Amino acid sequence: LIHFGNYRLPFGGVGTSGIGAYHGKHGFDTFSHHKSISKRGTWFDPPVRYAPYNGKLGLIKKMFKCKTSPEVGGMGHSVKRKEDARFLHGKGNYTDDVKLPGMLSMVIVRSPYAYAKILSINKEKALAIDGVLAVITGEDLAQYNLHWMPTLLSDSQMVLPTDTVMHQSQEVCAVIATDRYIAVDGAEAVDVQYEPMKALVDPWKALDDDAPLLRPDKEGQKDNQIYHWERGEREKTDAAIAAADVVVKERIHLPRIHVASIETCGVVASYDKDTEKMLIYLTSQAPHAIRTILALVAGHVGLSEEKIRIIAPDIGGGFGGKVPVYPGYVIAIAASFLIGKPVKWIEDRSENLVNGFARDYHMDCELAATKDGKIQAFKVSTLADHGYTDSSANPSKYPTGMFSICTGSYDYEHAFAELDAVYTNKAPGGVAYRCSFRVTEAVHAIERMVDKLAAEIKMDPAEIRFKNFIKKEQFPYASPLGWSYDSGDYKQTLEKAMEMVGYDDYKKEQAEKRAQGKLMGIGICTFTEVVGAGPSKDFDILGIAMFDSAEIRVHPTGKALARFGTKSQGQGHETTYAQILAEELGIPYTDIEIDEGDTDTAPYGLGTYASRSTPT
């Protein structure tokens, strides 16, 4: 059971648990537990009703008072998705489908060691292969100062190393050839000599005084700690825990996980020496932001932002993994710039699975309560292993993302959270995976401890949540770690969810099976999440304020073209955006074309991730 407690959408639109007000000052805070939805100052009720279907499964049936006719197909109408036909007929256009005249292929040579000095890179055998045009190394890129690039959180990482590899699978050099098969042969022929060093892979040992300094390239870096962050009142929280009737403790490890989209990452870069412009086809969830970052990397060689055009075609799954700028992208772009021909790089599955990780959080949690289950205090101390660079996309104001939402949907007075992030000899960590800026880790911490408390005092997991929920009349509510919760009715929402799935029947079935020696688990999770990556006063990527834009053109025929700074990876923008516009303009949704993903035509926006834009 998942309870979307206070699911905020600053951008607005349709969220995964209901319809959010998307217009004007009401651009947030309206979901299934609310009594009504605001749209342009007009309130209508009810937004959502639930109808049980086929016993315990419980189908959510959304019933709206539709403003438009079925022919117009505005919000609330069940319509055919406009984008599905091309995918079902195999006519999707992905990055690997892009073919340009004279296009070359790139394959990357990667390090077999987690930590090693590069003694030499011998290109001769590779360059002797017919069809191999170039082998690009860090030394080659260093001549143009293109061998380093920023991450999304103001850290830095190598595009290609010049002397030291920092993690197994790190990019060492790239082979450019007339086709992929020849490029693979060339990569196998490159002879790299290494001097392996003892790798530092234990995040706890990374903080030892005698630990090797992994990032001496960073000015002022004296140890392997990236940052220390804390929020709340340590002393008052410790005192409340010490005085409590019941205290449960646990060290929770959320290990590294990886996005496994059907489509891996890829890029086609084409530099035109005549116009001095770079055209890039890219698997990107945030094309405009990536263009800005690439300009930061390559602006000094003439590739300023207005000379870079990024087109994000159809994307075969994003989940946060296609938000960052990966070294492979920059290498391909640099290769096209240096050679003067289009260069394609498509990550293979093996490469994909050894780069771009999320999580790796070690969380020491303490939850204190009265003997009858009323929570009094929560404390969590976290060690985050970010690998050799911090690849998080967190706002600069919140280096740990939204981890301070870890107090959850519960009412208690005292909380304290702290986090230490460290470097190790692992692939870059901190990449998003299906979460809004560390919310998943935060939710796991508090929910695991609430379940542990329920087991300790032998209380039903649902009952202990009801006992501790923020009450409807307490909103707006100030959390002990500084968040302002605008509205909600958590009790009613969980009650409805339990009714829909038949919770009481499941409990009876569980008891019967346990009597027979069988195991059956029932899981409950309730959470409050900050989503939408906004407003801009609080959220940014490398100083770029988080906002989004739209442009609508109505043709003389009465049809319309709408362009957005977002980018769909399956969210259904072509349908849902058209429905929203149909609602407002009265133009049939079938007559509204949605265009996004091209930085030359779409207005500037920060893309689609962390529940930004409209999932359907």
Give the residues covered by each predicted segment.
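Glycine-rich loop/linker segments at domain edges
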Residues: 77, 83-86, 151, 223-267, ...
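Alpha-helical support elements that line or immediately flank enzyme active sites
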Residues: 108-138, 174-193, 267-339, 395-407, ...
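Short, surface-exposed loop/turn segments at secondary-structure boundaries that line and modulate
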Residues: 136-170, 204-216, 285, 289, ...
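Helix-loop-helix junctions that connect adjacent transmembrane helices in secondary transporters/permeases
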Residues: 212-299, 471-559
